[in-house]
Regions:
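Cytosolic regulatory regions of ion transport systems
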Residues: 1-171
Length: 171
């Protein structure tokens, strides 16, 4: 019964092994948090010098020098055995292609960073990955701050309109 429910996605598998593609600032912050929570973290980064840097600041992570969009490297690094894949390269297209490959390889949890809204909605529509967008996260935080500040000072919002697929708000 457990296997059946798991296949339906009704039982979440515990995530232990996380593979991150790309070694930028978001990766560093995320890897630090994951390592503190005792996850096994492996990072694939293209730039050799950056791999050296990552290995010094993230000594408990496994750092791999290679192209994370190369299917052979992904297979060598055990993409089929990873519990979660997080695509954080600087290229939306590369992140999407890697996510689609991970989906084909049946990775349990796929998280993809995209900056282009139409790409985000495409990935969410086909159900390949959970999508994060730094721009949307930032704007959401700013809006939350402005609203809390306005509420603190007794602001009365009479009407709030959401436009363009909830991406624009007019007061």
């Amino acid at each position: 019964i457990k296997i059946f429910l798991n296949k339906l996605g009704l039982i979440e598998t515990k995530i232990k092994n996380v593979l991150i593609i790309g070694g930028g600032k978001i990766t560093i912050y995320l890897a630090e948090a994951l390592l503190k929570s005792r996850y096994n973290v492996k990072i694939i980064e293209k730039e050799y010098d950056h791999c050296v840097y990552l290995s010094t600041i993230l000594p408990n992570a496994t750092i791999i020098h290679g192209d994370g969009s190369d299917q052979n490297i992904l297979k060598e690094e055990g993409i089929g055995d990873t519990d979660a894949l997080i695509c954080l390269t600087g290229s939306d297209e590369e992140n999407i292609i890697i996510s689609m490959y991970a989906y084909k390889e049946k990775v349990k949890k796929i998280i993809t960073k995209v900056n282009t809204p139409s790409f985000a909605s495409l990935l969410e529509t086909i159900g390949v990955a959970s999508v994060i967008s730094p721009k949307e996260i930032t704007s959401s935080k700013i809006i939350r701050y402005v609203r809390s500040s306005a509420n603190k000072h007794g602001s009365n919002i009479l009407t709030l309109y959401k436009l363009v697929n909830n991406r624009v708000e007019a007061v």
